[in-house]
Amino acid sequence: MKVRIGFGLGTRNQLHDGSLITVVEAMEDLGYDSLWVSERVSSGCPDPIVAMSVAAARTTRMKIGMSVMVLPGRNPVLLAKQLATLDRISDGRLLPAFGLGAVDEGEQQAFGVERTTRGALFDETLEVVRKCWADADVHHEGTHFTLRNVRVEPKPVQRFPEVWLGGGSPSELRRVARLGEGWLPSFVTPEQAATGWAELSALAATHGRSIDPEHFGVVIPYALQPLPNATVEALRQRAKGAVDDVVPQSVEHAESLIRRFIDVGASKFVLLPLADPGTADAWVEEMSALATRLLPLQT
């Protein structure tokens, strides 16, 4: 089992200027395995395609992923070309991870998607993206998209980029079982993750599929400063339990939690700050503090 630790920027960051370059370069220099960018139109966080392009140009080793990119509402052909280009520029370092998008009226309006149809649109969009990556001439007759002899170039360096999906609800696990190559849940305890992995493996088998055990990951939200009471209460409702079980609030606690996840079979981790560290220097300081204690866990 190869333990790898990446770092996510989240949706609260304001790294939409040259500070992004400083943070990305420091992340690779510190030894993190991967960078993960998030998406929120109404937030100051940078656009994921642009942020990943910056990272691809300023790094040589670190993998580049999304945690997560909203899929429903995007043109699948253009998205396939954008991501294939990114995979080529980065020499095969792309880690695609997609989601349905925030349950927020403004965000859904921004993507032009109704909540009641976004699940079906997600499935078909991903199907078309994969066809564009793999097929010389793309044919597709679906509910939302029709393509006849459409050629999409370039193709990605990775023959079939492996798609990571998150979530832990029954419907989300069913989607991962049908469509995903990797599972990346968040706000879960090690015990919940282990139960979810067992359920996912059984569901995948019903579709004649299996998920590689090396693709069992977890997003670990953390807070190195005290959280406001309102945030703690919101986290408690989301986590369905004690916040301390899913949100480490010290470097030592983060190490202990990762070790517990490793014990139940997880091996890919994304550290995600719940509070924006602020300046580029503050980001680097926080990443450095975590790296000293956590990156030795990588194998």
Predicted regions mapped to residue ranges:
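Flexible, glycine-rich active-site loops centered on histidine and acidic residues
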Residues: K2-L15, G73-H139, S186-F187, E191-Q192
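N-terminal beta1-alpha1-beta2 module of alpha/beta enzyme domains
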Residues: M1-T59, F160-P161, L272-D281, E285, ...
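Short, acidic/polar
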Residues: L15-M27, L78-Q82, L165-R178, Q249-R260
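Glycine-enriched alpha-helix->loop->beta-strand junction motifs that scaffold or abut catalytic
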Residues: G31, R58-R61, S90, G112, ...
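An alpha-helical appendage that flanks or caps ligand/catalytic pockets
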Residues: F111, R115-P156, S186-A289, R293-T299
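Hydrophobic faces of well-ordered beta-strands that scaffold small-molecule active sites
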Residues: I5-L9, L35-V37, K63-S67, L94-F98, ...
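Conserved, mostly hydrophobic/aromatic
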Residues: M27, G31, A55, L86, ...
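Active-site mouth loops of central-metabolism enzymes
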Residues: I5-G18, M69-V77, V157-G168, R238-E252
